[in-house]
Amino acid sequence: MSAINTFLLQHNLCIATNPCVSPDFCLAWAGLRAAIENAQPIHVWPHSRFETAAGSWMLLEDTATGDCAWRLDVAGGEAPVDLLAAGAALKTGAVIFPATFANLLRLKNLIQEHNPASTIFPSATAQLGRSTLGVGARFTTLHWPAVEWAMAQLGIGVTANQNSIPRELVYDTDVMLAGKLDSVPFPFIGTNVPEGHQGQSVEGMSHGCVLSKLKTGFHTRGIAWSFNADHQPIGGKFDSREDALVTGCVLASYITFDLSPELAQTKVADDAAAWCAANVPAALIATVKARVAQAGLTLNEADFSKLLAYVWPSLQKMKARDGKYAAARAKLFTTDAGRAYLRELSIDELPGLTTPETTAIMLALCEALGMKIHFVAPAFGFQKNMPYPDNVALRGLIEKQWAVCKDFGASIGFHSGSGKSAENYQVMGEVTGGRLEIKTSGRYTYEMGRALFASKNPADQALWRDWYEFTVELAILGAYSADATEQKMARIFVTDALSKCGRGVDVFSSPTATRSAIESLAPSPEHMFWFEYNFLHVLAAGGRAEKAALGDHTPAGYRQRARFYAISDEGRLNFAKNIATYLVFLAQNTGLAPAAVCETARAKLAGYQNLAALLAGIAR
């Protein structure tokens, strides 16, 4: 048994209330196998059926534990017991297999060899490489049914799971158990938080999002969807573990390359042109210059040399990493569909607003290196969860970038894309003709807060109160921190909430005064301090608002995480409706779905009185 499965079982942490921590979706195969063999009550997911050359498959689950199994039925004969690992024959002639990650990888080949157009697994279809909405899973997996509903009703595929790895997801559970995860700086809270601060592993998320499509029957719609391994760090301190990152992300159908770790340690030579002449192939330089000129841009030679000297080391490492992603897929998967993946180049980490010339140079470099870029993410000056204040200026910025991207056959990735105005999204969609990606991961913890706040369920209300108090405590601690950045940001968060409620903002004479001012407000998910600190609650040991408790990968952290998976059906329905409503809003305003289709979807959402009714709208 793997170390992570042993850890989970020893501490009574089951998949039902802590999914996606282990790469496997079966922790105790012997018990599940015996239960199935002895005809004990095991749930058969009715919409999960799919076919391979070997026969017909169904997904089974012990809903008390969350342990899952595959059942293979063969018409008129016995199913092969060794098709996947650890198979067991039933008296009926069917065979069952544990839902391990290794079996999932083998099953992907069987499915795609039989039907290359299958939409059970994330894919890299041409349409997904042109237009998508990025749905981030910043703290739980509870958003999946809502995303599946929205895709089903709108008839479009999106990036149905998006996570920064290793920032948000655990890239290696053995490293986690050894207490050796690196940490991520969060300047606004004045501390570093361990990587994987959501608690789940990248393989677990990859596994879980596939099973979700089968449980709800979304795969019967035949709509392709993608999984984005976001902000894959290139170079710097990540060189030593890039092989582990590649292995963990093998089911991702969409990779975002983040050059910032290598850029942070790159010093540009005083004579950049001479450095480029000595270190960059002359033929490549000539190719890039010609390609940029073909796109209608004139380069400043000095600026070109400085940029090339700055980015060349990171691009060489990006090329090597890209080769590893391709090799890992070629080794494991047998079909072109199973091996394909999309690429996004994140250049919003480069200094300042991105110029069209910079975008053209970066795209030309990737093109010359044989890396097709499907999405490129320039810097537009967006702030997370805040509308862009000037639509005329925004249109001008996007038009300049789109002229370049269109020439290179790339779409624009809008990072920090959540919380913009309808007019902002309309501009994005109109200028690009829908050739865009909007990343919205900052939105979904907020929607969970709204869901719990509105729920009448006592347990949901208790979780909401604890969650809100957690953010209050962090805000007060931060407002009096010795760290200047932490103090500044905390006070901004507090005064924003107070001013929007018509209260005075001169409240920092003492912690007592600040607490009194905050406590005069009615608890609300609309307060900025709640919005900014909320994602840290999910893995805070004991739910404590203490820096040492954040991102806790011990049983205490995972027991806290289980509270979110225990919310009521009312809370889940509220959450699903909130998410689906937001996705419909995005799809309509960007032009990815017709207004009439979106209006029909909104009417359906408004009519749902229970979670089962919404879930029933997913399968064909």
Predicted regions and their residues:
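Short, conserved phosphate-binding/catalytic loop or strand-edge motifs used
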Residues: 337-343
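Conserved, mostly hydrophobic/aromatic
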Residues: 230, 345, 415
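Short, charged/polar micro-motifs that form catalytic or ligand-binding hotspots
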Residues: 134-138, 297, 301-312, 349-352, ...
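Aromatic- and acidic-residue-enriched carbohydrate-binding clefts of CAZyme catalytic domains
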Residues: 181, 271-305, 379-381
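Active-site beta->alpha loop and helix N-cap motifs at the rims of alpha/beta catalytic domains
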Residues: 196-211, 225, 231-239, 285-297, ...
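Active-site capping/gating regions of soluble enzymes
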Residues: 1-213, 217-220, 224, 237-261, ...
